[in-house]
């Protein structure tokens, strides 16, 4: 029996030399030495799929190892029969993966075998000697982003509380966490604050903040320079990974595949993952389903546009930081007119400061109106999906005219094919030309549910790829909406 165990230990050792750490861990960690009957050594696998994959991938290699070491008559038999069904004698002879590694250490006279094994990964690292990254730096964390200077309101309170909790106890709960919402609402501020606060409270942890674009560029560069192993090592040895604007990875299957494996490696090791996105995971298109499912494993929390009271607080805070005094009526006017996001509110205060500092004039209503107009015009010019840019009524008007559909039908419950098709297109156009959520779009299209709207959007997206006529129709409609 002891000889058979040593043979199995030998096989594991030889295979370890040829596999990556991740592959070895995936395929062999859950195997269990059961017994030997004559020249047959029985190894238990966790399920039938695992058994079939092990046999398919490693039978040839195992035979080579046995032959090379003079065990020509020995056969390794894999079974998916649960260990508990074996007799008490066989149960006592069963050897787990950890025990097999310990046995091999003893066989070699390795003194490390006397120490307790903390984890399978730790043991694997003893055989696959890879150095962890040294001199770890986090160049993209900006110290100006803190929880202390984040303005809290009903639109972002849950996201704030979750972010603070993550900083205090990374990897314990809310893992992964995805914060989503429109442009300029504070997602980056919270993500950076998580990194800064965690660094302050847990200075021994390796924390990395990166934008999705930088993550992509770094991956592409690693392929060009044949340093993908270095790239993987950098990201899979982290204690906390913070990726901003994950939606920028849409339609990029290669980097999505890499992110999927990085996600798994960190998640299985209880390392914290936090992402930001401009929409909820269910609304992401051109993203692999398995990656979207990873995002929904933990907490998904949204940040909506600030209400009037919060807008006032944001302006007051920015004015205080910039050292200017804003009269109450001016402050309220800016808060009433600039309703888009935090970024635009702060831009308004910055412009006010410029007038005061450079022109040395007193701020009045006319100047404020001019500043607000500049901000709104800029928002229209730079935000392709802004709800200010294209009026919802114009979208509907063009759609009804071009498809020859009655107003009552598009928002009604008719199931005629041409009406249903028009509703699908309406939902798709609203999603592409406005910042409305699927719930808000559903209310516009006759009280449809989130899932119904999402189905419509995805259907048109698929049809455009597969049906030239549909694609031409949508393109024509979109061009007319833009020109209108």
UniProtKB/Swiss-Prot annotation:
Give the region (Domain III, AAA+ region) as residue ranges: 140-356
Protein's UniProt name:
Chromosomal replication initiator protein DnaA
| UniProt free text on domains | Domain I is involved in oligomerization and binding regulators, domain II is flexibile and of varying length in different bacteria, domain III forms the AAA+ region, while domain IV binds dsDNA.
Where this protein primarily resides, as one coarse class? Answer: cytoplasm
Instruction: Specify the superkingdom.
Output: Bacteria
Function text: Plays an essential role in the initiation and regulation of chromosomal replication. ATP-DnaA binds to the origin of replication (oriC) to initiate formation of the DNA replication initiation complex once per cell cycle. Binds the DnaA box (a 9 base pair repeat at the origin) and separates the double-stranded (ds)DNA. Forms a right-handed helical filament on oriC DNA; dsDNA binds to the exterior of the filament while single-stranded (ss)DNA is stabiized in the filament's interior.
- GO-annotated cellular components: cytoplasm; plasma membrane
